[in-house]
């Protein structure tokens, strides 16, 4: 399932990977600051976009329009990659391997199957890796730069959290596609009128049955244009505010817009809608433990045996769990409280500790458990279900505000970077 992010690591990445091609003399397609976009980059992306469109049975615009979109995408990528190089942004091999493994998993493939699929489609695996690395650098630079421009006030979180709470039962997620008809900075009235006329003409075409994906590829200046403008699933509150109101009564299949923003005119298509329950209840546990840490004077095995003896003494009534914790436990945070860890959700604990704890019944004590901290005796004192809806709503409100503001800021930021860069297109 896709989220409403500007860039995603998914199978669509394959569409950004250059094809292996016969060795010919390469040419410069565009100069971007102190870098270049090569004809092979344009041709490779052109071929792979066509391949993906064919696999998705999606119509494409004419080659000249598609080439323009691809050129703009590669120019923007080059600008951001140059920024990343200046900032020293690097993606390790481990991060890259994990990202590729996630892509394979999202598409229900093993890595070997993914390699085979790439080869079948004529894609070189090393070239694919390099492209994914570039996409990760681009994403990190953009995310870091845009987030620095965003401020979220506590009052905003409180206000949106209340709205989310009031709308819990009627909450809806939307699957959207998007077309952006751009405006330059400080546009003239003629430029605004021309862009609005173009947007209205596209709305008319879409409402009369034209393929929205093809229209997006042909006309949209949004980063998702080459994916047919697909934004995927998300909550209405995660969208820019100017979109949310326009979509409040939208139905499946509706074409909404044009909507004016600071960067241009937006057109939205509602591909689908679905509801979702917002009530959130979690199970908390009240536990206590005794921790022994292996050291130069206590081996791992000695720590385990010592805990077995302590457990036997507790069971026989020779001592209590609390007294033993105060005497023996090496956890400075809980020893003086008789090992009491208070109420918490199990997922905050070390995995081995958590797994052992969740297997216990109320009042039951575990056998010695080994974790990354050492050896534990664990006793489950009680469990309870807690309504976390309010806290979850505030957390969700913060993330919605971040997504909303990020979407608005990212478009402005990218427009600024494009306007301030030296770009000379040498081929058409």
Swiss-Prot record:
Q: Keyword set for this entry?
A: Chaperone, Isomerase, Periplasm, Repeat, Rotamase, Signal
Q: Which domain of life is it from?
A: Bacteria
Q: Domain annotation text?
A: The PPIase activity resides only in the second parvulin domain. The N-terminal region and the C-terminal tail are necessary and sufficient for the chaperone activity of SurA. The PPIase activity is dispensable for SurA function as a SurA protein with a deletion of the parvulin domains is almost completely functional in vivo. The N-terminal region and the C-terminal tail are also required for porin recognition.
**What GO CC terms are in its UniProt record?**
outer membrane-bounded periplasmic space
Its catalytic activity?
A: [protein]-peptidylproline (omega=180) = [protein]-peptidylproline (omega=0)
**GO molecular function: any one?**
peptidyl-prolyl cis-trans isomerase activity
**Function statement:** Chaperone involved in the correct folding and assembly of outer membrane proteins, such as OmpA, OmpF and LamB. Recognizes specific patterns of aromatic residues and the orientation of their side chains, which are found more frequently in integral outer membrane proteins. May act in both early periplasmic and late outer membrane-associated steps of protein maturation. Essential for the survival of E.coli in stationary phase. Required for pilus biogenesis.
Give the residue range of the signal peptide: 1-20
Q: What class of enzyme is it?
A: isomerase
Q: Name one GO biological process term.
A: chaperone-mediated protein folding
- The residue ranges of the PpiC domain are 171-272, 282-382
The enzyme's E.C. designation:
5.2.1.8
Cited Pfam families: Rotamase, Rotamase_3, SurA_N
Q: What is its main location?
A: periplasm
Q: Where does it localize?
A: Periplasm
Q: Which organism is it from?
A: Escherichia coli (strain K12)
Q: Which PANTHER family match?
A: CHAPERONE SURA (PTHR47637:SF1)
Q: What is this protein called?
A: Chaperone SurA
- Known InterPro entries for this protein? OMP_Chaperone_SurA, PPIase_dom_sf, PPIase_PpiC, PPIase_PpiC_CS, PPIase_SurA, SurA_N, Trigger_fact/SurA_dom_sf
């Amino acid at each position: 399932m896709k989220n409403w992010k500007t860039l995603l690591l998914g199978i669509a990445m394959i569409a950004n990977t250059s094809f292996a091609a016969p060795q010919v003399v390469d040419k410069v397609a565009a100069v971007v600051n102190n870098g270049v976009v090569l004809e092979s980059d344009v041709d490779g992306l052109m071929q792979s976009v066509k391949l993906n469109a064919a696999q998705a049975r999606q119509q494409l615009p004419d080659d000249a329009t598609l080439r323009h979109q691809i050129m703009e995408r590669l120019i923007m990528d080059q600008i951001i990659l140059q920024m990343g190089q200046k900032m020293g942004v690097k993606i390790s091999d481990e991060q890259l391997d994990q990202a590729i493994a996630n892509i394979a998993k999202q598409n229900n493939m093993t890595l070997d199957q993914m390699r085979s699929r790439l080869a079948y489609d004529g894609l070189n695996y090393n070239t694919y890796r390099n492209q994914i690395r570039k996409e990760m650098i681009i994403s990190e630079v953009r995310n870091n730069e845009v987030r620095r421009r965003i401020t979220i006030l506590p009052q905003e979180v409180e206000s949106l959290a209340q709205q989310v709470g009031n709308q819990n039962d009627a909450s809806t997620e939307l699957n959207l596609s998007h077309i952006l008809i751009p405006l330059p900075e400080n546009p003239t009235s003629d430029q605004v009128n021309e862009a609005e006329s173009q947007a209205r003409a596209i709305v008319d075409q879409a409402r009369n049955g034209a393929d929205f994906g093809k229209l997006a590829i042909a006309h949209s200046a949004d980063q998702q244009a080459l994916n047919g403008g697909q934004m995927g699933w998300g909550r209405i509150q995660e969208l820019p505010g100017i979109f949310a109101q326009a979509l409040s009564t939208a139905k499946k299949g509706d074409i909404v817009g044009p909507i004016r923003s600071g960067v241009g005119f937006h057109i939205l298509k509602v591909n689908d809608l679905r509801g979702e329950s917002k009530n959130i209840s979690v199970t908390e546990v009240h536990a206590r433990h005794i921790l022994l840490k292996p050291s130069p004077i206590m081996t791992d095995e000695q720590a385990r045996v010592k805990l077995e003896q302590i457990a036997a003494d507790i069971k026989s009534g020779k001592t209590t769990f609390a007294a033993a914790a105060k005497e023996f436990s090496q956890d400075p945070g809980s020893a003086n409280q008789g090992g009491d860890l208070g109420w918490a959700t199990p997922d905050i604990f070390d995995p081995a500790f958590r797994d052992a704890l969740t297997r216990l019944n109320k009042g039951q004590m575990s056998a010695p458990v080994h974790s990354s901290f050492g050896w534990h005796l664990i006793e489950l004192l009680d469990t309870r279900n807690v309504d976390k809806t309010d806290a979850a709503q505030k957390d969700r409100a913060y993330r919605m505000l971040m997504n909303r503001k990020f979407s608005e800021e990212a478009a402005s930021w990218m427009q600024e970077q494009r306007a301030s860069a030296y770009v000379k297109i040498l081929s058409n």
